[in-house]
């Protein structure tokens, strides 16, 4: 608690010369200052927004505070429910006789909560906001498909700042108010019952007309399972610590995650920042990239938004750079002469497709019939965990997997829909180049949103080159590891990076 620091962001109407309008942000800031002094917490930054007035329309006066505090990841807990039978209590904000928060007592309460989190007495915690206790509980149930049995009580009274926690031993908090316990499905309070679907639809559909949260399923998904084993023996000199070249273009944002996963797998990653501010910078970067590829065993194209996904399409900046003859020659030598590997994730996958490295295994000019990745069916960015099913283990990257294995991976993209002509899709299937597919909770490849987050044809999430040594996939396998996604069921590791490194040993 004592390490918390605040930032502020405001959005108010145009103030002009009206003293009353000036009083609105002043009152908000005085209130924020009063709370800061009471809690002994300082604000270290803020953002001043533009005018919130258009003609005669004003935005609702708003002051938002973001609270941040450093903590060991292993000590963090979830703010959503993950199992049934969890008993939930509300810890009210201590208040004085005038119903003003007693900040000193509230700070002491927060410190006690932290101690109980560390001791294991509290496994879940969240804060009541708009809608009171009921809204906070329901939102914490929806993510993992759980319900809740409410005890009789005042569920909708505003109780800003009250803490909702699961307690194994409620005697640690004599002031705790029992709220109820998690259930398999549905929400009940006395004789009132609301189904899970009703609650979920009410929560998700409020802004559905503005932010589409559904897309019609298009097409069928044939059986793409391919039984051939992966090529696991490297032709060439072995490497105790294979070298991995990771180019970081303007807009790339996953190079550090990718390097970390390779380092943990026993490789030696090298990140090279591509500079393009001047002609001299570009020439220098081209030479540096070519030399880095020449000393590498693996080239890994990380995710991000290279070049801001311009001009008119993702991955084009990377593809254009790697079509430079000096770079292209070294990359072809790596793949065709030195038996190297290449990997592209998300934006990197888009670059591999635009280069032709998947599905063709070589850099080649693209034609109208070439496979590509285009805009998601819901016409906006998606960011969520999805399940993928392994359809082929032809690639060395998937040597630790079996056909039919299912893994959870995070996706975050606006252009992830894989499309290709029918004959190209059939060729991928026959050659075992369909590596992974989006699947439902039963492990069946599907076109249904949100299991298939972008509408990819044949539910394709990842494909390989004909020999399997180049793999492109949309899911961010590099964003997995210990102490991540604590609000979700376990995210199983594909051992993708370990398999790529093992190929050279």
PLM features: residue spans?
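Conserved phosphate/anionic-ligand binding catalytic regions in large, soluble enzymes, centered on
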Residues: 1, 124-140, 251-255, 348, ...
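A glycine-rich phosphate/pyrophosphate-binding beta-strand-loop-alpha-helix module
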Residues: 1-52
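Intein/HINT protein-splicing elements and their conserved insertion hotspots or analogous self-processing inserts
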Residues: 25-27, 42, 48-159, 169-243, ...
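Solvent-exposed alpha-helices and their adjacent loops that cap or buttress functional pockets
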Residues: 36-37, 55-59, 79-84, 115-119, ...
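Short hydrophobic/aromatic beta-strand micro-patches
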Residues: 164-168
